[in-house]
Amino acid sequence: YTQGTGATTGNIVNLGDKTGTFTGSVTGTVAGGSNANNVTGNTLNINTNANVGNIENFEKLVFDLNSTVNTANAMLNLTGGAVTGSLDWRKLEVNTDSLTGAGIKTYEPYRVKLMENTSGISFQKGTDNTYTLGGGAKSAVTEKLEYVIDTNNSLGTGATSVSMEGYQFKGNTAAAYAAADGTHAEAWSGRTKIGNKVEGNTLTVSGGSLTAAAYGGLVENTKRNITTGQLLTTGSAAENTLKLAGGSIKDGYGADVRTKEGGAEKNVVTVSAGTATGDVYGAALTAAGAKGQATGNTVTIAGGAVTGDVH
């Protein structure tokens, strides 16, 4: 801090020490420095759940997902009643080293809310929308898992929260939806939100109800072109399987590819029992103006009932 005009740079604030819950609270503003014109090197490390009034003058925000984090609550809850602004989306980081994929279900991803401010969060710095310049949704990827970080409105302004979701896009061969899972809108075995190739996944539905759809593989891409700000169009699916062996679904897909350039090959649906009240697709390219190819996909009906069409 300075009462003058000098630089306040290279400063670090840690919320929590990774070994236990942050039991304190800060009603006021946590600042990396007092000079908003130069925040170089000012870093806020969020190591567990914390409530503070607001934050300002940080170049970098680092969220460490470790065992002390309660995923039922936002890691950084901003309660002061004013917008949190002038953040740099390009300098927001998440440490996922301790994550293993635990918590990912067939009907919902692993999810943690990184930060929340009901009064608003903005990644606009002067004339720069750093969210667009940073390519939109951020990601961390391992061999089979992806973690997608995005604002609640997928924009750099007007957001109220930033969350991270985890998906398995490859090799999820034991995914199951059973009677104990009850009723949900949809379930999947392999899924990407950032255009990865979804491959080698199998979902077996043996009970319960899915009111929208069941997917062997589901492909989306929420990343953006850094220059144009437009959503990217890549992402494909191969060798995914949906097995309907009981329960009820609406539509069923070996793979649903929602990217314009994406293709689908060698995906499979088998129906041996249960009911599909809608349509069944070996694979479907569902993006408007889809340019990819759907080849070598298979549907086998051995039992059960399909009310709609089979493609």
Language model regions located:
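Well-ordered, non-membrane alpha-helical segments in soluble/globular domains
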Residues: 12-13, 75-78, 106-107, 111, ...
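Outer-membrane translocation/initiation segment of Type V secreted surface proteins
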Residues: 96-181, 188-190
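Small-residue (G/S/T/A) turn/hinge positions that recur once per unit in extracellular repeat modules
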Residues: 8, 19, 24-25, 39, ...
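Fold-core signature of tandem repeat domains
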Residues: 13-15, 22, 26, 30, ...
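Tandem-repeat/low-complexity and Cys-motif detector
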Residues: 1-6, 29-39, 52, 100-104, ...
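Extracellular/lumenal ectodomain signal focusing on beta-strand-rich modules
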Residues: 28, 54-60, 80, 86, ...
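N-terminal segments that cap or nucleate solenoid repeat domains
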Residues: 1-4, 148-214, 241-249
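Extracellular beta-strand/loop-rich repeat segments of large surface/secreted proteins
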Residues: 17, 23, 27-106
